[in-house]
Amino acid sequence: MGQAPSSTAESNGRELDLRLWSPVIVAGGESMAVGNVVDRDFTGDLPDECLAHVFQFLGAGDRKRCSLVCKRWLLVDGQSRHRLSLDAKDEISSFLTSMFNRFDSVTKLALRCDRKSVSLSDEALAMISVRCLNLTRVKLRGCREITDLGMEDFAKNCKNLKKLSVGSCNFGAKGVNAMLEHCKLLEELSVKRLRGIHEAAELIHLPDDASSSSLRSICLKELVNGQVFEPLLATTRTLKTLKIIRCLGDWDKVLQMIANGKSSLSEIHLERLQVSDIGLSAISKCSNVETLHIVKTPECSNFGLIYVAERCKLLRKLHIDGWRTNRIGDEGLLSVAKHCLNLQELVLIGVNATHMSLAAIASNCEKLERLALCGSGTIGDTEIACIARKCGALRKFCIKGCPVSDRGIEALAVGCPNLVKLKVKKCKVVTGEIGDWLREQRRTLVVSMDGDETEAVVVVDGEVETVVEEPRVAQAGGIVAEIGSSNGGGGSRLAMIRSKLGFLAGRNLVTCTFRRWSHNDNASSST
């Protein structure tokens, strides 16, 4: 008794399930056999556009495996893949035709070759440019066999290019000028360790017939004769971002030439450069500057910072790494507090600021949301207590390598009402107990201290970096994970670069934490 009704209900439920998950609508009560349902490939009902959209959510390995499922998936994967990264050895040249027959929609291409291998040639690069006419972003790394002529042929075919990044290549100024001449839509240019640029190289400039330029960002890194870019930097009216990092030679004159033109610069990064207060005085003429990084420039002093503060009143983000030279201190920071009232982010590394300047900044810069104080012997409990009392808008606060004790951290329990993240590192007097106590007092505050992290060493672009993972219980037992990184010793290539740079050699203490804070809050800061 009860067996027959149960069997009927079970059968009806199975048929209902088939109707629910099958995309085929059975008309007129037509039934579908279970065997046919199992054998049916329902992905065949998906349009190619939907299948391509699904592929976009897969990682690189999963997407490669999916492309081997059937011929259709292989075709859809090739037609919908817009980003491609290739090992640019010379042996790849014979496969380029078949490769780009499959991947015919590539818009972002990266070609990388290791130092021990022979890279692809000018002919191979020209073939790529013919097959990929819609390229908008190109990255070349270690392609030492590519010459100026190869870059010129490439530029003639890739006229839609918007972003170009080259590093460790052997072509020179002629190749860069060819890109500027033919790629009218180019917006971002990044040049790193370009060996073809030497003292006898021609100047890099916009073409004479160029009525306007689309260039918005230029990054020059580790160049021996980077001053050849002076005409380009001085005449590009659309330029918004300029980064000059670890380049040899005197850069004061270049900055003066930029300032004498009608500059639209809003972001300037100067790192490990031979630049003095003369260069900072030139930067002060760029009144639209909102972001300024002065990192390990030992000839810069309070006088240069005062020039900038008095004229660049739109300044929102200021990073200073004084390299413990004691040339930038209270005097320059007091000027920042007086004139830069829109300041939202301040990072001080190796700067001996005291209660005097920090109190002025805390009182006057009412929009200050992100603050980092690192490697200063003059920042103690008094300074932290002052910040806690006066920085009402502060949201993220980092203290690293300063003589701060538990008493200073205690002040943050009642101060800085909008604080959401606190990081305390390498402060030897601070104990772990104060961190636990602070979490109890402010349950919405994420507190990260030395005892909370585990480190792992990884290699990124040939340079050793330390990745720090910091799991910490926040409110209601939730886990907050945060990743930070800082540059470590580095391999032989990095050591060679540092030995060439002489006085510029040293360890970069600017951690990714500050960059991440800046990027995460960029949208909210600009509104």
From Swiss-Prot:
It is found in: Nucleus. Pathway: Protein modification; protein ubiquitination. GO terms for molecular function: ubiquitin-protein transferase activity. Keywords: Nucleus, Ubl conjugation pathway. GO terms for cellular component: cytoplasm; nucleus. GO terms for biological process: protein ubiquitination. Its main location: nucleus. Residues 39-85 form the F-box domain. PANTHER family: F-BOX PROTEIN SKIP2, PARTNER OF PAIRED, ISOFORM B-RELATED. Component of SCF(ASK-cullin-F-box) E3 ubiquitin ligase complexes, which may mediate the ubiquitination and subsequent proteasomal degradation of target proteins. Part of a SCF (ASK-cullin-F-box) protein ligase complex. Interacts with SKP1A/ASK1, SKP1B/ASK2 and ASK11. The F-box is necessary for the interaction with ASK proteins. This is F-box protein SKIP2. It comes from Arabidopsis thaliana (Mouse-ear cress). The gene is SKIP2.
